[in-house]
């Protein structure tokens, strides 16, 4: 009786991300067919999601550190007096208990990792990769290939990281507001708007506000129909009224500080009643604010508001636009424009984002940018409040060794594990 030889190649055609990295050639009968074999080859039992190319203990410690610092668990027993749970279980990294009364609970419950089914080291991997790859974004497709998981699992993993970023981003907003309030407490620009303010703003951070459109809807998306009820940038994010007028694009409001943090907000329009509360929530009224001429109503709110005319005409008939239409008398909004270029280049990797999920992606990008500026230790009170100093947003903050705003802040979390950092083969 002839038997069909086993397939020499084992491929998973339904999900290539779960397949082996190289074709596995069958050179010997399987163990199930030869019970007496005691030498090689034999099947080695490997844990699920095993990946020898990644230093999983390193990323596990990062996840534990994040959960301990940002979501500490306290013992509910009255005798323990709300003691923080810090006793780990070697075989259960998702559990933690009290060293005194042995109270046991999950360290993932009521956190962004609530009911997390994947290994917890994957969350630390997403945080690590997002910080070191900035301004490039980490997509779900990239995670599915590197972690060898399905695309849906990678999408949910990225969504959990976006929830964590959205939860911690208000802390950066408070730090920025307090630093700007302390920096420009009694600051006043000259009342004459035509006077050059370059010397007045020297060694001071420029705060710029602007809007941009992501994934705009052209006439092809509207099946060749024009849009009569919308004008300006708003017209490029809505479909034609005959097609229902649904929003398919994203309008982003940007608040950026030079050499400092940036905050992106998804807005439906550019009306004053929509943008004014957002700006007042992020910036104190004494801040020198620089925009284009799309914000004429800001002069009644911010006394140090200045605008530049991007459509200024040239006095020379040989040219259409003036040379100073981008920067005039020290007034410009290039800080916001530069962040728009970084944002558009990064979000091109996603292809398209639905408007209802746009704020999560913007919060993630803002959090990674601000983590590169402030660091992560400042969020848990280990920075000593140095970000509130008057040099927090200085123009030479990157050059200072101990400045509160510094790119070097992104390494503060990983410096807690120098022994693991030396062993990480991915570096």
Predicted segments — roles?
Residues 2-427:
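Residue-level recognition of single "structural anchor" positions
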């Amino acid at each position: 009786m002839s038997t069909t030889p086993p397939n020499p190649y084992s491929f998973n055609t339904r999900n290539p991300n779960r397949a082996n990295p190289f074709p596995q050639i069958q050179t010997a009968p399987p163990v199930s067919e030869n019970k007496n074999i005691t030498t090689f080859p034999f099947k080695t039992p490997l844990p699920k999601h095993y990946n020898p190319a990644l230093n999983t203990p390193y990323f596990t410690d990062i996840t534990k550190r994040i959960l301990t610092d940002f979501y500490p668990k306290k013992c509910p027993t009255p005798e323990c007096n709300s003691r923080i749970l810090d006793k780990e279980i070697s075989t259960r990294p998702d559990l933690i208990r009290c060293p005194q009364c042995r109270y046991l609970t999950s360290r993932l419950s009521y956190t962004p990792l609530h009911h997390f089914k994947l290994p917890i080291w994957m969350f630390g991997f997403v945080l690590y990769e997002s910080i070191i790859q900035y301004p490039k974004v980490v997509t779900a497709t990239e995670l599915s290939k590197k972690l060898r998981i399905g695309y849906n699992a990678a999408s949910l993993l990225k969504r959990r990281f976006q929830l964590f970023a959205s939860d911690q981003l208000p802390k950066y907003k408070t730090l920025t507001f307090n630093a700007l309030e302390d920096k420009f407490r009694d600051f006043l620009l000259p009342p004459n708007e035509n006077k050059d303010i370059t010397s007045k703003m020297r060694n001071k951070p420029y705060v710029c506000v602007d809007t941009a459109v992501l994934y705009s809807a052209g006439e092809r998306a509207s099946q060749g129909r024009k849009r009569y009820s919308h004008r300006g940038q708003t017209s490029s994010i809505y479909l034609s009224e005959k097609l229902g007028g649904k929003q398919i694009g994203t309008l982003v409001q940007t608040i950026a500080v030079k050499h400092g943090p940036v905050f992106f907000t998804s807005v439906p329009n550019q009306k004053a009643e929509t943008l004014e509360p957002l700006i007042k929530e992020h910036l104190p009224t004494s801040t020198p604010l620089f925009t284009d001429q799309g914000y004429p109503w800001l002069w009644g709110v911010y006394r140090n508001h200045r605008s530049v005319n991007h459509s200024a005409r040239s006095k020379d008939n040989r040219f259409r636009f003036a040379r100073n239409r981008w920067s005039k008398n020290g007034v410009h909004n290039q800080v916001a424009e530069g962040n728009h270029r970084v944002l558009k280049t990064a979000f091109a990797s996603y292809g398209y984002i639905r408007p209802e999920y746009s704020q999560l992606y913007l919060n993630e990008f803002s959090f990674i940018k601000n983590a590169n500026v402030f660091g992560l230790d400042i969020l848990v009170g280990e920075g000593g409040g140095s970000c509130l100093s008057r040099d927090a947003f200085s123009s030479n903050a990157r050059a200072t060794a101990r400045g509160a705003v510094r790119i070097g802040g992104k390494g503060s979390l990983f410096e807690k594990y120098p022994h693991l950092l030396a062993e990480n083969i991915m570096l």
